[in-house]
Amino acid sequence: ENKQEATQPAVIEKNGHKVTIFNYMDSDNFKEYSSDVMPVAGDSSPGYSAWDDVESPKQISAAKENGSDFIIVYMHYGNEYSRSPNQMQEKISHKAIDAGADTVVGSHTHVTEGIEMYNGKPIFYNLGNFIFDQSNTATHRAYFLNFQITGDNVTSVVYPVDINGYLPHFMSSSDGRSLLEQLNPQCPQMKITDDGTGELSFSLNSTENYTSPSF
């Protein structure tokens, strides 16, 4: 009904872990749309939860302080059909990690974008399509994620898929490896398995130093 409700995260408690999921949209990318078509939630009006450079990091930090074990920030951002993240995507994602997020997962571009490790935490800039169908063959290649939490360690399993008839289908091992190898130069920490899936492990308490990738 309003901005306060729109920015509330989903909280899931399972197997002794408290998982918090925030969902934001980069409103700067959609300025061409009128507020009637795509309204931002206001103090007393409904709409989507827009990323705010000041307030959103505060919300993430508060979740960490309130005992969240694993924080996911799901972003709707980026330029459609671009295979590389733009500067705003990188800025938002880094701010989210700095505020306490354990991973950032992106959507919107309809194609896959690179994976980055920032200060020991993964950023999946864009998963591509899922239950969606387009004629452009570049939009048929995508992936989804499975986060496996064991103590303070997390393994992100990356499953490449083909979109056919509005439905995702697991890729063959060779096609899966091909897709992951395209993403891998930006994230050499990711292991590509023989069956064509990816595995990226990290610690919830990581203090790794950051090295900027070249997308």
Where are these regions (language model features)?
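Acidic, metal/ion-coordinating pockets
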Residues: 1-215
